[in-house]
Amino acid sequence: STYAQEGKKQERQGAERERLSPEQRNQLQLKKMTLDLNLNESQQKEIAKILEEQSAKRQAEMATFKANKDKGVKPTAEERFAMKNKKLDEAIAVKAKVQKVLTPEQFKKWEDMKKENRENMKERMEKRRDKKSAE
């Protein structure tokens, strides 16, 4: 149908869209946090550092993952465990850093926002999975 073809065209256009640079993503995330949590200037500077560290680590991980994928190398069960373990350790460290910067009220709100974002992401992933299985 024409409608189905339009949907595919839109998906392709989305893939061609330019991605934001890590710096742009960090800047937008910082501004959103500033608005949502009412961050003061010193908090903004500290959060910006945390976001930059996270971004650098994420870029390095993605580069490694892409290089392995291009070579056709899949991680072993042990490597997957190590990666997940490392990711959780980093999440704990980030949480501790953020907690030092924010007030208890801000931290509670940040935790709530993260939880809501995870739930929204889960819903979107389920919708995508349902859409793919229907095709």
Regions found by a protein language model. Give the residues of each.
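Classical N-terminal targeting signals for secretion and organelle import
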Residues: 1-24, 41-42, 67, 78, ...
